[in-house]
């Protein structure tokens, strides 16, 4: 051990020389510089998440001055010795950077979106938002360093003072970086000012002499021209004051025709309380003209089973608008002030995202304000469409709907909710609409953004689907449609069949003379009632075929012509409106029967004078099937929870952006894009008043031929069909099982087009009848009978 220790003590470790240490440090610096240059290269071009993250970390410190900072860092890494020889250059650059940081930070907090926000917190929120999403999108000002510099300066000198101080820093820094001396600069400005004063005095004297000479020459020329013009051209001749020559009339300049390029302020149109109504004109099929009068025996053909007993309505009086309550007009003067601020915010937001666009026009509607934006040439429309969430954030709005582009205009519409919603009452809408007494099915639906009343004619539609979530205004809209028709039509002109499985929405209309039968609330009865309407449609077509007409208008024209030439009077066929308040409940109970009836009515009922209004609060594909949508082309969408529901109703997004409370998108059959409307509000008291008035005019006269009859409890309990004794599909299911020698609920669903509940009950009935055996776990059931 002693020898080993002595050996260790005997060894001497060699210390590196200064040159070697300097070389090692140089190698380390070079490796570090290359590594940093490699990282900064990714940051400069924002390559991948690493590049974006490093770039955002630099932005966190110096904001949008990341590029100058990166280049300065590269120079420092690779030119350290050169920088040591130019201390003034380094100091000037630092002062210039401080001035730029202050300028950028002052500009950031001059924007409307950043006012009244904490300086440091607001800056960090912007950068961390981009950092978390791996993007570089928002303007970050001067970053954390700029915020620290801006806080005391803005506190002492305000935001404008920060701009001025930042400018002084910039000038001072640039001066220090330049090779000039202070005295040289002062002498330069002094000499330049002296030369400018001398030149200014010379130009002033020269202009004075030229004006004096021109004035004398002009006076002399005008006198000579006036003397000659009095004799040769009359007293009204035009004279050029510079040359003294007489001008022709064709040479005179009309200042009114001068079209200068003047920048105009955006036009702001306030919400009008009494705009002109704008109706969707619909052409009702005209009555066919015929010179041959129908024979009396043809009009009384008993084989057609049509009731021609005249029913008098001489004492029936149509309801007046006084039955509906008035509403106090809303003062929306506050909205105009907000609109001006929002226009500025919109344009600043577009600028921050690098989009050149100006707000050309703003229309204040009852519930939303529509800003019409003109994008510059070369700006893609989808760039504005993709900013919906960012615009909602900048405007502090609940939601923003973008219409890109506006149909018929080279503009993009941005719809922003108002701070206060102006209620549109049914009375206000009715008084402002251009009502046509001869169009019984024309209904004022709501007000557009510009305040105009939009109406639709159900005869043109000819069927309407109304869908929206609970509380969005769907039932109120249906009540408004019914009230509009009741205001125009007598009981002999229009009949209603109302189906209300919820039993609370349409029951108030019971016992009015316009009803064919009492309001149907039983879902099983509803499917049978719809089948009765289909039978009525077929009967009417047989009637049209017998008399050689194509539609109800032609038939009623023949009846009217017959009544003028015959003592026996007949009544024309009334229009029939079928209203279903909750389609989803019917589809759950008898989907196949209800869907078949709706499809047949949708395809053929228009010419027969039968129209449908289908309402549902569950706009899913199992309720609104593809066949139903194909045969009900006109849609009204209220607020829904998702874009999927909106596409189910309208075949496009948009309804998920609505506000509720009557805010709707109306897409009629003759328009490619939906129109946003604010629906009218009709209260329960208004409905009760008009119903009471109508009941006083006439009593209900129900038609027993449309009565669906009684439904047993067993029928009610069966979801998609009847019991084992009365189920019409039992024999079909039995034949199918015996033919295939297989039995399963899924097979019955596919082959018979029934729901799962009904298929399961059919399996139970087949088991009770001894056709199939009992269930054996996961094994298929045995078929006990053969074909």
UniProtKB/Swiss-Prot annotation:
<comment type="similarity">
    <text>Belongs to the FtsK/SpoIIIE/SftA family.</text>
</comment>
<dbReference type="InterPro" id="IPR050206">
    <property type="entry name" value="FtsK/SpoIIIE/SftA"/>
</dbReference>
<keyword id="KW-0132">Cell division</keyword>
<dbReference type="InterPro" id="IPR036388">
    <property type="entry name" value="WH-like_DNA-bd_sf"/>
</dbReference>
<dbReference type="GO" id="GO:0007059">
    <property type="term" value="P:chromosome segregation"/>
</dbReference>
<dbReference type="InterPro" id="IPR002543">
    <property type="entry name" value="FtsK_dom"/>
</dbReference>
<dbReference type="Pfam" id="PF17854">
    <property type="entry name" value="FtsK_alpha"/>
</dbReference>
<feature type="binding site">
    <location>
        <begin position="471"/>
        <end position="476"/>
    </location>
    <ligand>
        <name>ATP</name>
    </ligand>
</feature>
<dbReference type="GO" id="GO:0003677">
    <property type="term" value="F:DNA binding"/>
</dbReference>
<feature type="compositionally biased region" description="Basic residues">
    <location>
        <begin position="1"/>
        <end position="16"/>
    </location>
</feature>
<keyword id="KW-0472">Membrane</keyword>
<dbReference type="GO" id="GO:0051301">
    <property type="term" value="P:cell division"/>
</dbReference>
<keyword id="KW-0131">Cell cycle</keyword>
<dbReference type="GO" id="GO:0005524">
    <property type="term" value="F:ATP binding"/>
</dbReference>
<feature type="compositionally biased region" description="Acidic residues">
    <location>
        <begin position="702"/>
        <end position="716"/>
    </location>
</feature>
<dbReference type="InterPro" id="IPR036390">
    <property type="entry name" value="WH_DNA-bd_sf"/>
</dbReference>
<dbReference type="InterPro" id="IPR027417">
    <property type="entry name" value="P-loop_NTPase"/>
</dbReference>
<dbReference type="GO" id="GO:0016887">
    <property type="term" value="F:ATP hydrolysis activity"/>
</dbReference>
<feature type="region of interest" description="Disordered">
    <location>
        <begin position="702"/>
        <end position="729"/>
    </location>
</feature>
<keyword id="KW-0547">Nucleotide-binding</keyword>
<dbReference type="Pfam" id="PF09397">
    <property type="entry name" value="FtsK_gamma"/>
</dbReference>
<dbReference type="InterPro" id="IPR018541">
    <property type="entry name" value="Ftsk_gamma"/>
</dbReference>
<keyword id="KW-1003">Cell membrane</keyword>
<feature type="transmembrane region" description="Helical">
    <location>
        <begin position="134"/>
        <end position="156"/>
    </location>
</feature>
<feature type="transmembrane region" description="Helical">
    <location>
        <begin position="31"/>
        <end position="53"/>
    </location>
</feature>
<keyword id="KW-1133">Transmembrane helix</keyword>
<feature type="region of interest" description="Disordered">
    <location>
        <begin position="279"/>
        <end position="303"/>
    </location>
</feature>
<dbReference type="GO" id="GO:0005886">
    <property type="term" value="C:plasma membrane"/>
</dbReference>
<feature type="topological domain" description="Cytoplasmic">
    <location>
        <begin position="184"/>
        <end position="787"/>
    </location>
</feature>
<protein>
    <recommendedName>
        <fullName>DNA translocase FtsK</fullName>
    </recommendedName>
</protein>
<feature type="transmembrane region" description="Helical">
    <location>
        <begin position="161"/>
        <end position="183"/>
    </location>
</feature>
<feature type="transmembrane region" description="Helical">
    <location>
        <begin position="57"/>
        <end position="79"/>
    </location>
</feature>
<keyword id="KW-0067">ATP-binding</keyword>
<keyword id="KW-0238">DNA-binding</keyword>
<dbReference type="InterPro" id="IPR003593">
    <property type="entry name" value="AAA+_ATPase"/>
</dbReference>
<comment type="subunit">
    <text>Homohexamer. Forms a ring that surrounds DNA.</text>
</comment>
<comment type="function">
    <text>Essential cell division protein that coordinates cell division and chromosome segregation. The N-terminus is involved in assembly of the cell-division machinery. The C-terminus functions as a DNA motor that moves dsDNA in an ATP-dependent manner towards the difSL recombination site, which is located within the replication terminus region. Required for activation of the XerS recombinase, allowing activation of chromosome unlinking by recombination.</text>
</comment>
<keyword id="KW-0812">Transmembrane</keyword>
<feature type="transmembrane region" description="Helical">
    <location>
        <begin position="92"/>
        <end position="114"/>
    </location>
</feature>
<keyword id="KW-0159">Chromosome partition</keyword>
<dbReference type="Pfam" id="PF01580">
    <property type="entry name" value="FtsK_SpoIIIE"/>
</dbReference>
<feature type="region of interest" description="Disordered">
    <location>
        <begin position="1"/>
        <end position="21"/>
    </location>
</feature>
